[in-house]
């Protein structure tokens, strides 16, 4: 039995990807997306239709006076939901959809954006139990999650690097947290100059283990989903964690690796540990956060990274929109041109009706039957014409 099969027996495996084909391959229970993953998927040929249709619909719904910025802003949210809906057709569990990282320090705006995303899922017939709203684990983000959870909107608190963040999330009644294992390791390697950390000594592994044991010791229902892995050694050390979100490359490596996988995290063992409970309020949170150099740096870095990823997606969609609008302009011009030459309105331009040069007519008359149809003109100009037929 390979390691992936064994891991599934003790941990919920989540696919960290927006690539629908990869999700179909590894059949995870849950999946998570973010702007970086959606940007990557949006540039893959097989997903172009989703992107283009989302932009067209956003443009149509906002009306002719809408700016490209307004269209793209609406399309970003709709695209996240569109990919989420596609993913939910494949997986049996939940999909995580991210709130704009630029709202990470604005509780009210985060709540509003989350409600908008959930309303889009519900309009598509998907219940709240199948969606997690992903929010950065700032104090403001945690407060937003507390409000949303009371409304039945489940949250995934991400960019979690410090123990204080985990405690605050648990006390807020958050559904799930995503501590970033690999990014913690990255920070310590850079800080210490140490090239390698064996699995049990990996600072990210140690952090998640501490959080998991604390939650299980005190009976918090908040789920722990380890994220951002650098190697399968980290995954092996966290076998038994509630959930692990893993990239397709590492899923493939686990699938290709055999050997015994021992459970490392166990609620029964956690219950026997001598752990002191921490009282958490805003002052304590901010004091602990300021004292935790790694968590402070990585949270800010993560928010900036998520913001940059979102801006990259917006730029990509603006380019897509410009292409679509260019095609629409060309199509409109071609339709006008056809109507100018179709003098009797029968949907066919004969050589007698054609007022241009013979060379152009001959180029458009691909089958040389002496007639130019809308299809002929569309093919000649690189567009598709859908003309109303004359009565």
From Swiss-Prot:
Keywords, A to Z? Calcium, Cytoplasm, Metal-binding, Pentose shunt, Repeat, Schiff base, Transferase
Cited Gene3D superfamilies? Aldolase class I (3.20.20.70), EF-hand (1.10.238.10)
UniProt-listed InterPro entries: Aldolase_TIM, EF-hand-dom_pair, EF_Hand_1_Ca_BS, EF_hand_dom, TAL/FSA, Transaldolase_1, Transaldolase_AS
Domain EF-hand: from-to ranges: 329-364, 365-387
Question: Listed GO cellular component terms?
Answer: cytoplasm
The family line of this record is:
Belongs to the transaldolase family. Type 1 subfamily.
Cited HAMAP family? Transaldolase_1 (MF_00492)
Could you identify this protein by its name? Answer: Transaldolase
Underlying gene? tal
């Amino acid at each position: 039995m390979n390691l992936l099969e064994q891991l599934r027996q003790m941990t919920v495996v989540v696919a960290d990807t927006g690539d629908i084909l990869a999700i179909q391959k590894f059949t995870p229970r849950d999946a998570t997306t973010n702007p970086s993953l959606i940007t990557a998927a949006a540039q893959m040929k097989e997903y172009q239709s989703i992107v283009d249709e989302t932009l067209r619909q956003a443009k149509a719904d906002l009306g002719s006076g809408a700016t490209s910025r307004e269209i793209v802003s609406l399309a970003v949210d709709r695209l996240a939901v569109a990919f989420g809906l596609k993913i939910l057709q494949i997986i049996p569990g939940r999909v995580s959809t991210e709130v704009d990282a630029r709202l990470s320090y604005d509780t009210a705006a985060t709540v509003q954006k989350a409600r908008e995303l959930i309303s889009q899922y519900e309009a598509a017939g998907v219940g709240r139990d199948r969606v997690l709203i992903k929010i950065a684990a700032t104090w403001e983000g945690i407060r937003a999650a507390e409000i949303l959870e009371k409304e039945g909107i489940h949250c995934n608190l991400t960019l979690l690097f410090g123990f204080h963040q985990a405690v605050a999330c648990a006390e807020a009644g958050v559904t799930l947290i995503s501590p970033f294992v690999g990014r913690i390791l990255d920070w310590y390697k850079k800080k210490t100059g140490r090239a390698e950390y064996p699995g049990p000594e990996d600072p990210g592994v140690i952090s998640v283990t501490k959080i998991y044991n604390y939650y299980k010791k005190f009976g918090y229902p908040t789920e722990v989903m380890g994220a951002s892995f650098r190697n399968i050694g980290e995954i092996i050390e966290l076998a038994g964690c509630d959930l692990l979100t893993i990239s397709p490359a590492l899923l493939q490596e686990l699938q290709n690796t055999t050997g015994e996988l021992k459970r490392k995290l166990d609620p029964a063992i956690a219950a026997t540990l001598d752990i002191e409970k921490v009282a958490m309020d805003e002052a304590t949170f901010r004091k602990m956060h300021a004292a935790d150099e790694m968590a402070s740096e990585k949270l800010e870095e993560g928010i900036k990274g998520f913001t940059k990823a979102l801006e990259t997606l917006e730029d990509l969609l603006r380019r897509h929109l410009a292409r679509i609008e260019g095609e629409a302009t060309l199509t409109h011009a071609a339709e006008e041109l056809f109507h100018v030459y179709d003098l009797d309105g029968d949907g066919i331009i004969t050589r007698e009706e054609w007022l241009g040069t013979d060379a152009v007519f001959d180029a458009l008359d691909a089958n040389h039957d002496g007639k130019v149809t809308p299809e002929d003109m569309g093919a000649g100009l690189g567009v598709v014409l859908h003309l109303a037929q004359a009565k």
